[in-house]
Design a protein with these regions (language model features):
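Extracellular/periplasmic helix-loop-helix junctions in multi-pass membrane proteins
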Residues: 328-333, 403, 441-445, 466-481
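Extramembrane terminal tails and long inter-domain/linker segments of multi-pass membrane proteins
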Residues: 1-46, 87-99, 111-160, 231-257, ...
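Membrane-interface transmembrane-helix boundary segments in multi-pass integral membrane proteins
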Residues: 334-340, 405-425, 473-497
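Hydrophobic cores of alpha-helical transmembrane segments in multi-pass inner/ER membrane proteins
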Residues: 179-184, 216-217, 268-279, 342-357, ...
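Central hydrophobic cores of alpha-helical transmembrane segments
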Residues: 218, 447-457
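Aromatic-anchored segments of alpha-helical transmembrane domains
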Residues: 25, 314-318, 453-464
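Long, contiguous internal "core" modules enriched in hydrophobic/ aromatic residues
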Residues: 145-148, 255-421, 514
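Transmembrane-helix bundle segments that line or gate the permeation/cavity pathway
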Residues: 31-39, 162, 172-289
Length: 522
């Protein structure tokens, strides 16, 4: 029996996508173009900070200048302001300037330019500093301190729409990760010759069908970063690896063999080639097995599944370092790849169960019984624990070691992200252990639907927390822009999955373990 992708279902999904786009546009139009600052070196070697303000500022120019001077004085820095608004009026900046639209230079007095330590974390055009809190013997130059004051006293720079680009990365990675989790799961079942999951095979293949679409979104975000349309990955700015540049960062420069445009794109080709080719191969052989039968194709899938697991173990970790961990360029964790992997795997199992119950409500997949649902529920429960274990292991070791270059990652997240971070950890750990422990809960449709939906959203929030602190810093929000983009991606993701699901029978044929699986009762 095939799934019928009816016009009604398509229409409802288009409505969901459109509603998400409307929310996104409203949120996007409401973004404030607040502050943009860069450090410039003058001919005589002194430094100044050029700051441009645009519109919708929540304070007056005089109020802001007073606050910055006061904060700078507390840090032993003396600054003077040179108003540039009138100077640029003829260039289109100040033609309609008013109290909340202005531009000026901040001039540091000569003694303030004597630096203490190194410029730890300059990030090119939007020099913002990665260390927002001091730890141990970490020191900041007056330029860094002043930049920190600017971001504390003023509103965040979103001239390049960092919030929109960062959300695009969050959603692209989250939904691509679900497809990747399904690909890993089907390869795992092939390699272990599992019989319990045969009835889920076509659902897994349908979710894998998102990978080519998800790859397009990711490549677009990466290309935008390479072209400097966004500044999510600060190491992509050549200034930070140029010793003659004021923004030179020795830590990033030492990572250049790994964090370079050439190696980044070389590895991207490998990531996508391996994932997409294996996904296509598994699907092709699955359909071929329906027609031919026998064990030859099954044994080929067994070999390919084992090979994929080896490649995936390496590539999934390096992929997460390149795509996510390098956003916080100075920081690293050898456990990070496994933590990210556990998140995408559990998200995939959650979506599988939600989709199964929806299909059952539509009169499909009657061959999936309570025992099959119980088995998948056990995976959802177990991987939720794996996610929590890896989160705790990474956090505990970094916290206990108390090494400055490591704890800065959590210092950034213990600021304005503290409540959302701990809520995410609590939800993704407490809810499964309290509500999914029993056998009955893992078989219950209402329980799985409610808990699954909550966990699904909070694993999206988990990816949000991985990306945002290093790209928009403390100036995050979950508003119409975030909700709208998530809803649109979700609608498009479901559309692609259901479209793929409709192209083949819901139950495979000629699989060696099919009869065993159909009569499974536990």
């Amino acid at each position: 029996m095939n799934f019928q992708f009816t016009s009604k279902i398509k229409r409802n999904l288009f409505i969901i996508i459109a509603a998400g786009l409307v929310m996104f546009v409203i949120g996007f139009m409401g973004e404030k173009n607040h502050m943009y600052s860069t450090v410039e070196t003058s001919e005589d070697g002194s430094e100044s900070v050029l700051v441009e303000y645009y519109k919708e500022l929540p304070f007056s120019k005089e109020e802001f200048i007073s606050n910055v001077k006061s904060s700078a004085s507390e840090n032993g820095i003396s600054v003077d302001f040179e108003d540039m608004t009138a100077h640029h009026a003829g260039e289109g900046h100040g033609e309609s300037a008013h109290h909340d639209e202005f531009e000026f230079k901040m001039l540091l007095t000569p003694h303030a330019l004597e630096t203490e330590g190194s410029h730890d974390d300059a990030h090119g055009d939007e020099a913002h500093g990665d260390d927002h809190g001091s730890h141990g013997a970490v020191h900041h130059s007056p330029i860094e301190t002043l930049e920190h004051i600017l971001h504390e006293e003023g509103s965040f720079t979103d001239t390049g729409h960092a919030r929109s680009w960062s959300n695009l990365l969050v959603n692209s990675f989250f939904f691509f990760g679900i497809g990747l989790g399904a690909l890993f799961f089907i390869a795992l079942q092939y390699a272990t010759e599992s019989g319990w999951g045969v009835v889920y095979k076509r659902i897994l293949e349908a979710i894998i069908g998102w990978l080519p679409v998800g790859a397009i979104f990711l490549v677009f975000v990466f290309f935008a970063g390479s072209m400097h349309w966004n500044h999510i990955w600060h190491w992509m700015d050549p200034a930070v690896t140029d010793p003659t540049n004021a923004h030179f960062d020795p830590i990033i420069a030492n990572k250049k063999p790994f964090l370079s445009q050439g190696f980044f794109w070389f590895m991207n080709v490998i990531y996508f080639a391996v994932f997409l080719l294996f996904a296509r191969g598994f699907r092709k052989r699955s359909l071929q097995e329906d027609l031919e039968g026998g064990t030859k194709i099954h044994m080929k899938n067994f070999a390919k599944g084992a090979l994929f697991l080896v490649l995936f173990g390496y590539l999934s970790s390096v992929m997460s370092w390149h795509w996510i961990m390098s956003i916080d360029t100075h920081w690293f964790s050898t456990l990070f790849g496994w933590f990210v992997f556990s998140g995408i795997w559990v998200s995939a199992t959650i979506f599988i169960l939600l989709l199964v119950f929806w299909l059952k409500g539509q009169g499909y997949v009657e061959f999936i019984n309570e025992s099959h649902i119980h088995d998948m529920g056990k995976w959802m429960f177990a991987i939720s624990f794996l996610w929590t274990y890896l989160f705790f292991s990474q956090f505990m070791l970094i916290w206990y070691a108390d090494i400055p270059e490591e704890v800065t990652y959590y210092l950034d997240r213990f600021g304005n992200y503290k409540w959302i971070l701990w809520t995410t950890v609590a939800v993704n750990f407490v809810i499964p252990i309290v509500l999914l422990m029993s056998r009955e809960a893992k078989r219950s449709k209402p329980t799985i639907l409610i808990i699954g939906a909550i966990l699904f959203v909070f694993h999206w929030v988990d990816v949000f927390i991985l990306v945002m602190p290093g790209s928009v810093f403390d100036h995050w929000s979950i508003g119409l822009l975030e909700v709208g983009m998530f809803v649109s991606f979700l609608g498009l993701f479901i559309f692609v999955v259901l479209r793929t699901l409709s192209k083949a029978p819901l139950l495979v044929k000629n699989h060696p373990y099919l009869d065993e699986n159909l009569h499974q009762h536990t």
